[in-house]
Amino acid sequence: RYGSYDRRGRLSNRVSIEQRPAEVENRQRLGDWEVDTMIGKRHKQALVTLIERKSRLVLLRKVEQRTAEAVEGAITHLLKPWILDVHTITADNGKEFAHHERIAEELNADFYFAHPNAAWERGSNENAIGLVRQYFPKKQSFDHITLEDTELVMNLLNNRPRKCLDFKTPIEVFSEQSVALNT
C-alpha cells in the first residue's frame, strides 16, 4: 500500500552516510559510487544502476530478480574492472543490499547507507535513474531488455555532455582522472 514500508527487519552492520568522509560529499576524488535498483513492471526484474559521483559515469546491469545475491553479483561485476577507482559505495536501505559487507570486502571499499526516505542524500543516482527512464519508462517490462540494450544506454549517457562537467562527457572526465586507466 502507498505509504507502507517493509517491516521484515533491518540490515545488519549498516554504516550511516553520516560516517562517510567529507571528500565524498564534495566530489573531490574519483571512486565514490552511488547504487540503486530500478524496478520493472510487476516488480519482477530490475536494473542495478551505479553512478560515480565526480564524473557522473553511469553503469547498468539487468538482474532477473531483485535479491541480495543477484544485486551483489551485478555490483561486483560492474565495478571489478574499475576496482582501483572504488573507494565508497552509498545505497538506500533496500533489502537487496543485504550483502553489503561481502560487496565491500570484494571491492575493498567502504559501504554506506543513506537515511530512510532521504533520496536527496543520493541525488546523483536519483538523477541518473531519471535519465535512464528516458530509455526504459516506468511502465515498461524489463523482460525484453538485453545486455546490448543496457550497454547502448550506458554509452549514450556516458557520452552526453553535461553542464555540471563544463560540457565534458562523463567518460572524458572519468578517463582523465582514472587510476585504472592511467596505470
Model-identified regions with their sequence ranges:
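Mobile-element integrase/transposase regions
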Residues: 1-47
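Mobile genetic element proteins and their domesticated derivatives, centered on retroelements
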Residues: 36, 50, 56, 75, ...
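Active-site beta-loop-alpha junctions of metal-dependent nucleic acid enzymes
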Residues: 39-43, 60-83
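Coil-to-beta-strand transition motifs
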Residues: 43-45, 53-58
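Short small-residue beta-strand/loop micro-motif enriched in glycine and branched aliphatics
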Residues: 56-61, 113, 138-140
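RNase H-like two-metal-ion nuclease catalytic core shared by retroviral integrases
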Residues: 91-93, 98-101, 106, 113-134, ...
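C-terminal domain-tail junction helix/linker
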Residues: 138-183
